[in-house]
Amino acid sequence: MGQCGITSSKTVLVFLNLIFWGAAGILCYVGAYVFITYDDYDHFFEDVYTLIPAVVIIAVGALLFIIGLIGCCATIRESRCGLATFVIILLLVFVTEVVVVVLGYVYRAKVENEVDRSIQKVYKTYNGTNPDAASRAIDYVQRQLHCCGIHNYSDWENTDWFKETKNQSVPLSCCRETASNCNGSLAHPSDLYAEGCEALVVKKLQEIMMHVIWAALAFAAIQLLGMLCACIVLCRRSRDPAYELLITGGTYA
């Protein structure tokens, strides 16, 4: 019965180590996705510390690949030292992922205030020229999120760009995709996106942070199972002389 439990634990442990390799790739992808998306929205969110969970999640992903390798070798070879190292590293990574989850929730709560403060500045500096990074960021967000202005398209009337152009129109990025003849004129509001960008940017950034949180939680649960199986094998190996002889190839006298 005990040997059956050991075999089952070892089988699950080897399978989990294979999952760790897949998890390593997924975590690195999630972290990279956060970096790429942040680059598109960085003008609306000035707190670079928001990227800390993404940096940690990429580091955890790289470490999980190494953990999977150590775990497979230690499990197959029945190495007590290897399994102990495996459990300790898994525990450290588990704690790190808990920290990622906490940081994720902290920064997710800060998103709304950060965006509200930053988006006002960005819209005020809009000048409609392609070389200007802030202007490109606004046009990109309005096209991607199908929005116009901070709260709605009327916000453009309070910008310096609108007052300087004096043509009673908003940027072409405010035009609906279905409005083929749209020139941004406020005289044809039905051609413009009605929803403001602030709420949608906040929603997008919070969704990104939730991807990090859920990824960390999911793989933390898998790591708990891995630690449990490794501990079962370790404890059985330490307490059962017969099992020790079976591993080393010895026999009873």
UniProtKB/Swiss-Prot annotation:
Taken from the record, one Pfam family name reads: Tetraspanin
Q: Which residues lie on this side of the membrane: Extracellular?
A: 33-50, 107-212
Looking at the UniProt entry, the stretches that span the membrane are 12-32, 51-71, 86-106, 213-233
Entry GO terms, CC:
extracellular exosome; plasma membrane
Q: Which UniProt keywords apply?
A: Glycoprotein, Membrane, Transmembrane, Transmembrane helix
Q: Where in the cell is it found?
A: Membrane
UniProt topological domain (Cytoplasmic) ranges: 1-11, 72-85, 234-253
Where in the sequence does glycosylation occur per the annotation?
127, 152, 167, 183
The family database entries (PROSITE patterns) matched by this protein are listed as: TM4_1 (PS00421)
Q: How does it sit in the membrane?
A: Multi-pass membrane protein
- What SUPFAM superfamilies does UniProt report for this protein, alphabetically? Tetraspanin (SSF48652)
InterPro entries reported for this sequence: Tetraspanin/Peripherin, Tetraspanin_animals, Tetraspanin_CS, Tetraspanin_EC2_sf
Q: Which domain of life is it from?
A: Eukaryota
Its subunit composition reads: Interacts with claudin-11/CLDN11 and integrins.
Q: Which family does it belong to?
A: Belongs to the tetraspanin (TM4SF) family.
Role this protein plays: Regulates the proliferation and migration of oligodendrocytes, a process essential for normal myelination and repair.
Protein known as: Tetraspanin-3
Could you tell me which species this protein originates from?
Homo sapiens
